[in-house]
């Protein structure tokens, strides 16, 4: 069935949404304001899903600078939008999430971008020899990925991936543990294969510098989900002390190595589940930093942080929806002092959000 419709707004994942037979109809690769023809391939009781067939009236914000084949690949959800439209989509999404989920009005929001809008990823998982059409098992052969750093190349003949970075090296031991090393703000980080490290170094650096601005020399800081110690070690010079808590053993080993290698004395890493640590902890912390997974903070963790009563909570999130939901639980005791979004993943619908909460002065 072919439908004609006008795209009215965007879904959370950047799909265009119009209405056909009074049902919301989701179409990938279209822009708000465009009039299109689309083939409806899925019908439910409450919505349609459709595939773009023809653009009848095109938006001025459509991106024509990329080969059409790339639009079909999964992971490039916003590639058809120019940068102005991508920025507008992401800012609107953050503002709408906080309004709908937390009943909080963000009057003004900045979205920070790096210089690279393509070829910004220093790590990518690929299927050797080809990529796949979005939401399918059909393979497409492409000469390159538009998001991968141009220094990351494939040797097809020998089926090996080779990392070529002047400031990065690969290390190994007899136990075949493999690490990469990277440098940020003068601090060297060892990163194991099972440890997390941000894939867009330029934007990550902007975020960490911003976090550092909220740390004072007289503060004891608790860094939850501290990973390999990236935030803990980068803010150490600004704090009285930093305690990092992480349950992943490989990450803790990397964090302790990084602390010793960089000769940083005022940081302590603890290998423990965050909930268990907070339940046993008797130490007061002025500032708590959280950088949870996409699911956000569990309710038990929020309650334990509230009992700790830190003056500041610095919340870095890769999922604005769960960040807004968590703020809903904090807002009776804390107010938003600062919020800013970061375009960690251009050409995709993902957003990194930094929020700083300040304790309310109740009398």
Curated annotation (Swiss-Prot):
S-adenosyl-L-methionine binds at residues 198, 225, 246, 291. InterPro entries: MeTrfase_TrmA_AS, NA-bd_OB-fold, SAM-dependent_MTases_sf, U5_MeTrfase_fam. One of its GO terms (biological process) is rRNA base methylation. Keywords: Methyltransferase, S-adenosyl-L-methionine, Transferase. It is an enzyme of class 2 (transferase). The active site is at 318 (nucleophile). Its EC number is 2.1.1.-. GO terms for molecular function: rRNA (uridine-C5-)-methyltransferase activity. This is Uncharacterized RNA methyltransferase MMOB5020. The keyword Methyltransferase applies. Pfam families: tRNA_U5-meth_tr. PANTHER family: RNA M5U METHYLTRANSFERASE, TRNA (URACIL(54)-C(5))-METHYLTRANSFERASE. Belongs to the class I-like SAM-binding methyltransferase superfamily. RNA M5U methyltransferase family.
